[in-house]
């Protein structure tokens, strides 16, 4: 193994991991038992076709039969979750909108919410209303977008991201800014999307001046505004308390900057082979990419011990 990253965490290549027998060991090399697996979706559990591979499905179902909790932790709102996650019976808890809500699928109960404050929503709308960025609002589990942009995507087949995903998961409204203000007590996230990557640094600096807000990103062409304490990590902490599971008993996997805090919260942090370098730099293990069963591989190695 070799040491890298600002925190000096151990990065194990596959051959070194096998050689040194690390599966099942937490930070510090102590033998541990994983009781909860937290998984990002896009770029992690989902492959490029937005499906969950058979190997990963089998690994998750097998882990669940051994009593391990399988948790989705995604930047998507609940209504935008792919069908595949509902076909895996092992998955019970959904952490959505970057941790703004936790839903128990067994009962349909949303037992945790951490939305933006009304004041932050007002400030964000005021800041962004004169810009031409493409805005999305996640409100009570649904995603909303300007009707004019939605119709543009329908008409041209062009979008800042997957066209089919936009048309199937976004709800068009006439005036998104007004809609956000009318629902300012229930806004989970505001996403700012752009086509020119050169805009990102300046836009990020601007958004960082918002009061009581967290700014993160899940793919190159966006920035995401959440509440001051909203994150996948905080939601995972709250779920751990509810289930009586310590952070040392958790494994988390992700690929993007909005996964970093969650990976740092878990006993074993797994970065995808296709993940961004800043994610890989804080991981305990770098697995295969999302098109080569990276999640299934990590679950087999650290949980199933195969």
Model-derived features: positions:
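Short, acidic loop-to-helix structural element flanking the phosphoryl-transfer center
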Residues: 50-66, 113-120, 172-177, 227-241, ...
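Short active-site oxyanion
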Residues: 67-71, 90-92, 189, 248-249, ...
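Short, Lys/Arg-enriched N-terminal segments with co-localized hydrophobic residues
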Residues: 9-14, 18-31
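Conserved acidic, metal-coordinating active-site core of Asp-based
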Residues: 127, 131-133, 138-253
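Asp-based phosphoryl-transfer active-site loop
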Residues: 35-48
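Mg2+-dependent phosphoryl-transfer enzymes with acidic/Ser/Thr/Gly-rich catalytic loops
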Residues: 32-36, 53, 208, 223-306
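Extreme N-terminal basic, low-complexity initiation segments
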Residues: 1-10
């Amino acid at each position: 193994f070799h040491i890298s990253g600002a925190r000096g965490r151990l990065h194990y290549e596959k051959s070194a991991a096998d050689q040194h027998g690390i599966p099942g060991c937490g930070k510090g090399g102590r033998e541990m038992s994983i009781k909860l697996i937290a998984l990002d979706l896009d770029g992690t559990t989902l492959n490029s076709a937005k499906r969950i591979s058979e190997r990963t499905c089998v690994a998750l179902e097998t882990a669940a039969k051994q009593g391990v909790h399988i948790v989705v932790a995604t930047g998507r709102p609940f209504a935008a979750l792919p069908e595949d996650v509902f076909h895996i019976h092992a998955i019970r808890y959904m952490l959505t909108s970057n941790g703004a809500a936790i839903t128990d699928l067994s009962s349909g109960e949303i037992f945790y919410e951490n939305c933006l404050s009304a004041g932050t929503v007002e400030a964000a709308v005021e800041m962004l209303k004169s810009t031409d960025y493409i805005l999305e609002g996640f409100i009570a589990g649904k995603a909303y977008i300007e009707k004019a942009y939605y119709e543009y995507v329908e008409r041209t087949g062009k979008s800042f991201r997957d066209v089919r995903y936009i048309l199937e998961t976004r709800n068009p409204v006439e005036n998104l800014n007004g809609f956000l203000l009318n629902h300012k007590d229930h806004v989970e996230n505001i996403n700012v999307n752009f086509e020119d990557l050169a805009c990102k640094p300046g836009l990020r600096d601007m958004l960082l001046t918002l009061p009581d807000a967290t700014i993160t990103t899940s793919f190159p062409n966006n920035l995401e505004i959440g509440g001051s304490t909203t994150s996948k990590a905080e939601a995972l902490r709250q779920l751990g308390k509810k289930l009586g599971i310590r952070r040392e008993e958790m494994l988390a996997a992700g690929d993007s900057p909005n996964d970093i805090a969650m990976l740092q919260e878990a006993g074993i942090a797994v970065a995808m082979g296709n993940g961004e370098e800043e994610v890989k730099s804080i991981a305990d293990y770098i697995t295969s990419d999302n098109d080569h069963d990276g999640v299934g591989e990590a679950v087999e190695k650290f949980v199933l011990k195969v």
